[in-house]
From Swiss-Prot:
F(1)F(0) ATP synthase produces ATP from ADP in the presence of a proton or sodium gradient. F-type ATPases consist of two structural domains, F(1) containing the extramembraneous catalytic core and F(0) containing the membrane proton channel, linked together by a central stalk and a peripheral stalk. During catalysis, ATP synthesis in the catalytic domain of F(1) is coupled via a rotary mechanism of the central stalk subunits to proton translocation. This protein is part of the stalk that links CF(0) to CF(1). It either transmits conformational changes from CF(0) to CF(1) or is implicated in proton conduction. The gene is atpH. It is a peripheral membrane protein. Keywords: ATP synthesis, Cell inner membrane, Cell membrane, CF(1), Hydrogen ion transport, Ion transport, Membrane, Transport. F-type ATPases have 2 components, F(1) - the catalytic core - and F(0) - the membrane proton channel. F(1) has five subunits: alpha(3), beta(3), gamma(1), delta(1), epsilon(1). F(0) has three main subunits: a(1), b(2) and c(10-14). The alpha and beta chains form an alternating ring which encloses part of the gamma chain. F(1) is attached to F(0) by a central stalk formed by the gamma and epsilon chains, while a peripheral stalk is formed by the delta and b chains. Belongs to the ATPase delta chain family. This is ATP synthase subunit delta. GO terms for cellular component: plasma membrane; proton-transporting ATP synthase complex. Transmembrane segments: none annotated. It is found in: Cell inner membrane.
Length: 177
């Protein structure tokens, strides 16, 4: 079975189980933390895929990465994934769970990447209001600081990308020359 199907099926099953338990939001935060830790620490993926590491240690490591250690539903979901030999897919499962949660709750993920921290709260509020009117959903808004874009901004809304960065414009000029 391909990785996408496995991840999607597990994510949906975990979401439905969490929904029954009334813990879907707690699991969402745990899965966000887990996905973030996989992105920040590549050694985490290596550790999870290490055949010499016992299942119990993998479970403990994943629960620690979620930063929500007292939730029974989260522990149970991680145990099922690891015990079924699907630890290799856990990063994808976490990302698919996030997607499943946002879809069911009507949340739209918007991410603004700038060179400097956006301190203008009024501009953020206007942008969130504009996006929520256009998407007919609630906006989950994140700002990211990235000095590599030189100037301007990059706005990502779900699968749409608006790249108004100086770096992209310089690359376009470079390609034309």
């Amino acid at each position: 079975m391909e990785a996408g199907k496995i991840s999607t099926r597990y994510a949906r099953a975990i979401y439905e189980y969490a929904l029954e338990q009334g813990n879907e939001t707690i699991l969402y935060k745990g899965m966000q933390s887990l996905a973030k830790h996989f992105a920040m620490y590549p050694v985490l993926k290596k550790s999870i895929n290490d055949p010499t590491l016992s299942d119990e240690n993998k479970i403990k490591l994943l629960i620690a990465a979620c930063r929500i250690d007292s939730n029974k539903t989260l522990k149970q979901a991680i145990k099922v994934i690891v015990k079924n030999g699907r630890a290799y897919y856990i990063e994808r499962i976490a990302r698919m769970y996030e997607k499943e949660y946002r879809q069911s709750k009507g949340l739209v993920l918007a991410q603004l990447t700038t060179v400097g921290l956006t301190t203008n709260n009024e501009a953020k509020k206007l942008l969130i209001k504009f996006l929520s009117n256009k998407t007919n959903g609630q906006i989950e808004f994140k700002t990211i600081l990235n000095l590599d874009i030189i100037g301007g901004f990059i706005l990502e809304i779900e699968d749409l990308l608006l790249d108004a960065s100086v770096k992209r414009q310089l690359n376009q000029i470079k390609c034309q020359i």
